[in-house]
Amino acid sequence: MKRICSIYKSPRKNEMYLYVLKADALTRVPEGLLGIFGPPAHAFDLVLSPERQLAREDIATVLENLDKQGYHLQMPPPEEDYIQHLPDELLCRNDPV
């Protein structure tokens, strides 16, 4: 079943997103979560269906959370995903001899 979803970006946490059903807007999101999330900034709307793939979230989990609790919170990736690992030869290239 297809769902029209609004996706909001957190101003406090980089890469944290809140998925809600467009018809419900933010009415089903707990106040405590909104307090931690910060004032939601609308990013975009999206049609979700079981066939659709999302970049970092499992579509079945997102749809289930939207049906059961009215929202889905996408957490930022773990910090090690941000770190680019460089070879040792590049790390010590400018070291004094």
From Swiss-Prot:
According to the entry, every stretch annotated as the YcgL domain falls at: 3-87
Annotated PROSITE patterns? YCGL
Residue ranges spanning the membrane: these are: none
Instruction: State what protein this is by name.
Output: YcgL domain-containing protein Pmen_1774
Where in the sequence is the signal peptide annotated? none
Instruction: List, alphabetically, the PANTHER family matched.
Output: PROTEIN YCGL
Q: Which InterPro entries match?
A: YcgL-like_sf, YcgL_dom
| Gene3D superfamilies linked to this entry | YcgL domain (3.10.510.20)
Q: Which Pfam family is one of those matched by this entry? A: YcgL
